[in-house]
């Protein structure tokens, strides 16, 4: 048997990651434990030289060995304090030379003493000044094999360890960070005191209170009623059985609080502002409340609440909103195992069964630790990016026919919520398409928490600007004229990634101002030292970065190149009614979806009115769906594109969708007649589908086939149907000519005079087309009139 005092012992003060195991031992009244002997002796103060402990019997007794000649007036097993900090009981032993003190390796490591080093020794009275707060109500201990070669995972009876510990060290004074060697069944174990709970019986109502401490200066006497809890060192394979019953330490009618010894799930040094993510305060509150609150509870309380830990967290939303960034930051915040980060397609393999094996391998470490340590195991985080690429709806027929996609979904389901459930995992998934994921994965027990990471609002955009310009501000490079309130207003529907790109573009403009004239790749060193990034740099950058979910004003404005000519009261009424509907969508507490159908013959300006209303709404997201965007697509592909468009217009707080020439979108042909019923049904469903909570949508449709749509019941899907009339009066033609400044006044009057002989019926778009062609052809008045008449008759 090795002699423990003669070997260097590595002190492992790292805190275990596992919760404590409490001992089921009743606690009597605090005044009942017997007091240890208080020897009445002369004050002792000696300086002795450190030597090895004389034998293992002294080591496992947790005593320091001294020669009787040096302690003639001090009884055996009396407590002494070394260097004013470390308290031990003495064991008089003739094997120790006078003037020396025998310290085992674990003692020398704890006190940082070397052999031959002098140490100050004084007798110690824990009850000085009449204090009665020196009994241990509870003690938490880490345990591991002393010799790694003897380590094994055979079950070790926890209750027997507790009984042996109390028998060996009763009435000894113990303190946090102390390391003790104890022998059990012929094997030596290393035990570390992590936390003690001191009983205070000096309260006014004579009921005890309990004070937890992990401070080395906190000392207490181990008594028979002390609650002893063992748990493994971090990384140890020791296998402790659980106590037969959980201890209900009732003391005077109250239950003392015991701090759980499980490693804190949240890194104690973490601060929320360290995440570096702006505009997601509400989302983070939801994540912490639903995913992590249960894991920071003491295990005993969680068991009483029968709280099931969250195993899956799904982040979904448009690209660039920070889903992947959030997952990375959360994994750094968590104080568990190193997270496993995988992309969905990486799980797939061309070999039979390999895809399913890849899924199993992700959970292998968590399974092994959970089998060994149960609820005491660390949290294992698995991060899936592009979840929709692998875990599609089963039976959808979108796989290669091998059924691999279905099997991968089944494998993930069994690992997250199967027969052998794991309680030490958290799977974080990310996707742009929540609708593609198998619905079984979204039920409780799987990805039960689904957080939408949407486009940031104005406050969120300002936060993101502040994050990406923090170093510029700290280093004095950001000009004082930069107004983030202004920039956050100008960047409607920008994602976090797009705002970052905007900041980088502004920096590039600032750098370009400090390049040498005539040289693109040479920096002026004198000028660059004074560089400032100004407001103008950000405004220029706005021309470079366009939001994916923004308004394409150039394309929309081209639909009304000559502006809107309100040639009669009906047109003015259309704009007034349209504006009132816009105000309803913007401000109403109940009407979050409104739809308008503008109908009339071809060429009356329906598209121009629709796009102008959309642009005048000043909504942050305006989208146009027309037959032009669907050219070359088959019917199924068109349906998918329409589905994508409607999903996009649900992502911003305020949205406008212009559906132009609906008859062309549904492939309507009057010969037959023919149309796509599938596309029609999709449109009818989406026209009445309410947007998600917190989102508002205005739909403006146009058609030249009102009667046809009435028979198809499509008109009923719109809230309002507004007729757009053609020009029918000669005065209206005159207003158009005047607005366009066509020819001179006398020529305009001549045109009107000649047209007065005809019945006027022409769309304003058709009229403007004729006038523009005539203008650049330098037609005469008679030719202009003939062109207009031909257009009306054609």
UniProtKB/Swiss-Prot annotation:
Pfam families: AAA, AAA_lid_3, CDC48_2, CDC48_N. Gene3D superfamilies: 1.10.8.60, 2.40.40.20, 3.10.330.10, P-loop containing nucleotide triphosphate hydrolases. One of its GO terms (cellular component) is Golgi stack. GO terms for biological process: autophagosome assembly; endoplasmic reticulum to Golgi vesicle-mediated transport; Golgi to plasma membrane protein transport; inter-Golgi cisterna vesicle-mediated transport; SNARE complex disassembly; vacuole fusion, non-autophagic; vesicle fusion with Golgi apparatus. ATP binds at residues 317-324, 600-607. One of its GO terms (molecular function) is phosphatidic acid binding. It is found in: Cytoplasm. The keyword tRNA-binding does not apply. Disulfide bonds: none annotated. InterPro entries: AAA+_ATPase, AAA_lid_3, Asp_de-COase-like_dom_sf, ATPase_AAA_core, ATPase_AAA_CS, Cdc48_dom2, CDC48_domain_2-like_sf, CDC4_N-term_subdom. Residues 1-40 are annotated as: Disordered. Residues 9-21 have a biased composition (Polar residues). Its main location: cytoplasm. Residues 27-37 have a biased composition (Pro residues). Keywords: ATP-binding, Cytoplasm, ER-Golgi transport, Nucleotide-binding, Protein transport, Repeat, Transport. The keyword Methyltransferase does not apply. Belongs to the AAA ATPase family. Required for vesicle-mediated transport. Catalyzes the fusion of transport vesicles within the Golgi cisternae. Is also required for transport from the endoplasmic reticulum to the Golgi stack. Seems to function as a fusion protein required for the delivery of cargo proteins to all compartments of the Golgi stack independent of vesicle origin. This is Vesicular-fusion protein SEC18. The lineage of its organism: Eukaryota, Fungi, Dikarya, Ascomycota, Saccharomycotina.
């Amino acid at each position: 048997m090795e002699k423990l005092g003669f070997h260097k012992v590595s002190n492992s003060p790292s805190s275990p990651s596992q919760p404590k195991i409490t001992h089921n031992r009743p606690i009597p009244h605090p005044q009942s434990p017997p007091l240890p002997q208080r020897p009445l002796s002369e004050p002792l103060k000696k300086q002795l030289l450190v030597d090895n402990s004389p034998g293992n019997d002294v080591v496992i007794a947790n005593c320091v060995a001294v020669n009787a000649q040096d302690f003639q007036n001090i009884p055996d097993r009396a407590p002494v304090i070394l260097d004013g900090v470390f308290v031990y009981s003495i064991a008089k032993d003739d094997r120790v030379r006078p003037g020396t003190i025998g310290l085992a390796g674990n003692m020398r490591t704890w006190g940082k003493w070397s052999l031959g080093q002098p140490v100050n020794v004084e007798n110690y009275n824990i009850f000085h000044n009449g204090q009665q707060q020196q009994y241990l109500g509870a003690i938490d201990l880490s345990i591991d094999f002393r010799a790694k070669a003897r380590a094994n995972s055979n079950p070790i009876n926890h209750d027997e360890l507790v009984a042996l510990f109390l028998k060996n060290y009763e009435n000894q004074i113990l303190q946090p960070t102390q390391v003790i060697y104890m022998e059990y069944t012929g094997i030596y174990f290393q035990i570390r005191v992590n936390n003690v709970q001191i009983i205070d019986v000096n309260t006014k109502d004579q009921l005890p209170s309990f004070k937890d401490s992990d401070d080395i200066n906190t000392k207490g006497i181990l008594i028979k009623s002390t609650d002893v809890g063992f748990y493994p060192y971090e990384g140890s394979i020791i296998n402790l059985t659980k106590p037969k019953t959980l201890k209900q330490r009732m003391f005077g009618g109250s239950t003392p609080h015991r701090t759980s010894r499980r490693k804190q799930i949240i890194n104690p040094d973490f601060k929320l502002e360290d995440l570096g993510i702006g505009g997601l305060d509400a989302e983070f509150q939801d994540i912490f409340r639903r995913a992590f609150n249960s894991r920071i509870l003491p295990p005993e309380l969680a068991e009483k609440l029968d709280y099931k830990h969250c195993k899956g967290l799904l982040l979904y939303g448009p690209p660039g909103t920070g889903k992947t960034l959030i997952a990375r930051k959360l994994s750094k915040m968590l104080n568990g195992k190193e997270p496993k980060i995988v992309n969905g397609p990486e799980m797939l393999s061309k070999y039979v069964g390999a895809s399913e094996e890849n899924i199993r391998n992700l959970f292998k470490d968590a399974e092994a630790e959970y089998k060994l340590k149960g609820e005491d195991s660390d949290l294992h985080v698995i991060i899936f990016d592009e979840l929709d690429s692998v875990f599609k709806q089963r039976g959808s027929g979108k796989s290669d026919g091998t059924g691999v996609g279905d099997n991968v979904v089944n494998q993930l389901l069994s690992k997250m919520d199967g027969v052998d459930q794991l309680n030490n995992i958290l799977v974080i998934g990310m996707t742009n398409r929540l609708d593609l994921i198998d619905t079984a994965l979204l039920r409780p027990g799987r990805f039960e928490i689904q957080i939408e990471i949407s486009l940031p609002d104005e406050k969120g955009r300002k936060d993101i600007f502040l994050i990406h310009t923090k170093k510029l501000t700290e280093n004095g490079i950001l000009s004082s004229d930069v107004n983030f309130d202004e920039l956050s207003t100008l960047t409607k529907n920008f994602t976090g990634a797009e705002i970052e790109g905007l900041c980088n573009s502004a920096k590039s403009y600032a750098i370009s101002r400090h390049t040498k004239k005539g040289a693109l790749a040479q920096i002026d060193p004198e000028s660059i030292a004074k560089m400032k990034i100004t407001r103008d740099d950000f405004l220029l950058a706005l021309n470079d970065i366009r939001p994916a979910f923004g308004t394409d004003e150039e394309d929309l404005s081209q639909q009304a190149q000559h502006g809107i000519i309100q040639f009669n009261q009906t047109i003015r009424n259309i704009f007034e009614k349209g504006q009132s509907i816009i105000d309803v969508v913007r401000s109403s507490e109940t009407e979050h979806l409104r739809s308008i159908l503008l109908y009339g013959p071809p060429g009356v300006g329906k598209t121009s009115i629709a796009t102008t209303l959309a642009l005048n709404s000043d909504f942050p997201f305006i989208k146009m769906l027309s037959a032009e965007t669907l050219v070359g697509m088959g019917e199924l592909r068109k349906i998918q594109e329409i589905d994508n468009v409607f999903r996009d217009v649900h992502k911003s707080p305020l949205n406008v969708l212009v559906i132009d020439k609906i008859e062309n979108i549904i492939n309507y042909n009057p010969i037959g007649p023919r149309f796509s019923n599938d596309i029609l049904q999709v449109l009818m469903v989406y026209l009445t589908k309410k947007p998600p909570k917190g989102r508002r949508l205005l739909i403006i449709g146009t058609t030249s086939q009102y009667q046809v749509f009435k028979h198809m019941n499509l008109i009923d899907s719109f809230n309002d149907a507004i007729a757009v009339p053609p020009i029918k009066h000669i005065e209206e033609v005159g207003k158009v000519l005047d607005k366009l400044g066509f020819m001179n006044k006398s020529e305009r009057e001549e045109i009107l005079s000649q047209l007065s002989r005809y019945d006027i019926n022409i769309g304003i778009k058709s009229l403007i087309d004729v006038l523009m062609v005539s203008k650049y052809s330098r037609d005469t008045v008679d030719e202009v009139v003939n062109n207009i008449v031909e257009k009306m008759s054609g």
